[in-house]
């Protein structure tokens, strides 16, 4: 597993890996014990589009987190054209502390923190990293949710046509 720090350019890591899986941790500048975000990059044998999937914006939404972890196991980079970036748990603090909606370190909802701030709280830094480092690298960006502990959700989808 490699480790990259906040502000390191993800683009370089994406371009360096061909037909390879890279598991990395992005670290943020904070005193929070959960000051990191796991990222898996599956780079295909051939160049192609970059597809990003993020789960765990709300760390208590377990089904999407489990789904992307299973997906990572199923993908063979040698059979992939392009790159798949997966963030299985964007809000690590919320996941480990089992707190619905907010990060326990700063009590902020990551879903409402975008575009974030490089010098802000842990939640704002995570949002900023996703906004500045991950989204610009992505041809397709999918943020999946599953409903927190006290929610019942009806299936739906939303898509921007721009």
Question: What residue spans do the PLM features occupy?
Answer:
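Structured catalytic-domain cores with a bias toward divalent-metal coordination
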Residues: 3-162
